[in-house]
Amino acid sequence: MLLAVDCGNTNTVFALWDGDQMIGHWRTSTEWQRTADQYYVWLSTLMNLQGIKAQITDMIISSTVPRVVFNLRVLSDRYFNTRPLVVGKPECALPVDVRVDEGTTVGPDRLVNTVAGYEKYGGDLIVVDFGTATTFDVVAADGAYVGGVIAPGVNLSLEALHHAAAALPHVDISKPQNVIGTNTVACMQSGVFWGYVGLVREICDRIKAESGVPMKVISTGGLAPLFQQTADLFDAYEDDLTMQGLRRIHEHNKDIGNHA
């Protein structure tokens, strides 16, 4: 079985794969101080509660937080007796090319989404990921990652309003019934929601115009379902795109005889 780990700035997600079937999926907050022992106790407890008897033989990690990787490596070595693949490291091969400026470092989550998006939808694709940042990743016809856009995340924008303006409260994002708000919370929700709808539409339109070819647009990430309600923005929504990509990258490395 394969344990896939996606460590983001806010949350870390673990998924257990048996072949091409995901049989478990768990989320925790990202904390670099968390030890390998703590990860194992937490994970094994949740597996036991769900009656999952895991025989983990492989592990793959994607992390946008470098400080977390060390203890995840220890988890893999100590408890599963396997050396993990880490996306972005030289020992982890990708099944797609990366065509960006020399010396540029691309976030591993963006590469993983590219792999998964291309496998399912083919090329000429835009992947919009609503995470701590809102990212737009462009996949060429042959599956290559050719760049993208990074914008502030939705919740980050709401928090910035709250912290920078003393009179504005903390609010949760939701789709407002009307554009014109009749109270402060509704005004903030409208500004952020419809502002991001406009941001996504404009950036995707400009990417398509610059690319000069028809492109599919798919969404993923924690807040993607909220914006999926705006039907004309996306062609599809994928709730576990990153985990699908990690499974595919692991499979690719096995196929070429690369066992980290």
UniProtKB/Swiss-Prot annotation:
Do you know which InterPro entries this protein is assigned to?
A: ATPase_NBD (IPR043129), Type_III_PanK (IPR004619)
- Provide the binding site for substrate: G107, P108, D109, R110, T184
Task: Give its localization.
Answer: Cytoplasm
Keywords carried by this UniProt record: ATP-binding, Coenzyme A biosynthesis, Cytoplasm, Kinase, Metal-binding, Nucleotide-binding, Potassium, Transferase
Query: EC?
Result: 2.7.1.33
Q: Under which main EC class is this enzyme filed?
A: transferase
Q: What is this protein called?
A: Type III pantothenate kinase
Native species of this protein?
Answer: Ruegeria sp. (strain TM1040) (Silicibacter sp.)
Q: What is the lineage of its organism?
A: Bacteria, Pseudomonadati, Pseudomonadota, Alphaproteobacteria, Rhodobacterales
Gene assigned in the entry: coaX
